[in-house]
Amino acid sequence: VSGIQLSVNDMVRTGDWIVVQGTLANGVVIDITLITVKVQNFDNTIVTVPTYSLVTSSFQNWRGMEEGGGRRMTVNLNIDMDCVHFCTPDELEHLSSKVQVPAKGDHITNLELYRTYLATYIHRHPGINNNILTMVRYMDPTSTGLPVQIYCFTKNTSWAIYEGVKSQITDHAIASARDFGLKIFNWGE
């Protein structure tokens, strides 16, 4: 009965990437029978899961991500809040070559300009799907600084390509922080 429920409700298909909590299954479904689902994990091990456990418990199916046109990516960088300040006219002039400086007067912070710069950078990145939500936002401050979160979706859902895009964006965000007079929190300091 469980195998029929999986099929009729289109809960899982061969080729779906699934994660089953409480088991070692975290990979691609390679076979579905009435009583078992075989999953090939990313380390090439095979895990067999009873179909009833997929019907009676929750599991994560990544099919929606693969069909949805993007894989969600988040990067959090903790900014040392002691480095945040209002920009001087000289700083604004220098940074205007990197980012469009808003015409709102004297109260523009280096952090605001950095956030705007990153938002423009991810919007222009060829690996990012701009048809899905992209943003750069602040999270609640912590003892390690103010997290600046890059939130976007990669165009390609392949794990290796996703990690490549994420690395490019993370590298760029870390390297460009200094240009804005900002410092990323570092445990070693």
Regions found by a protein language model. Name each.
Residues 6-115:
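Soluble accessory domains appended to multi-pass membrane transport proteins
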Residues 97-189:
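Long, non-transmembrane cytosolic or organellar matrix-exposed soluble domains/tails
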